[in-house]
Amino acid sequence: MLLSRTADSMYWMARYIERAESVARLLDVGRRMSSLVPDPDDASSEWTSTIEAAGCEASFAETHGTPTASNVIDHLVRDVRNPSSIFACLATVRQNARAVRTALSQDVWDAVNGMWIESQEWRDEDFTVEGLPRVLDWVK
């Protein structure tokens, strides 16, 4: 029988994996929509919609101001001050997995830990409009 703390950590581990995937899908849609606009400087409404759909308007406004491709990508992928960013979600997944490591199979722990290690190897060029699809496909 699982202790409530163990069950809680496992639930949130799965929930944050799901949240990271949802943010990746939102970013992919925003990227595709912005690519349909002939002038990249006119694509701010697509990126604004992405921030709104992610529910991050307040945290985004505090740190970035006007939505552009680069600052929306930064906020939703690697800004750890944003609890809904992909990096923050992956960190929380790993933290919850570490808390209940003895209750996880070795395969699950290896997958979670490997996911975290691989995400730490991403480079700055992975967080551009051109490099983003590879990262988003990996997350999804």
Where are these regions (language model features)?
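Alpha-helical transmembrane segments and their helix-helix packing motifs
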Residues: 1-140
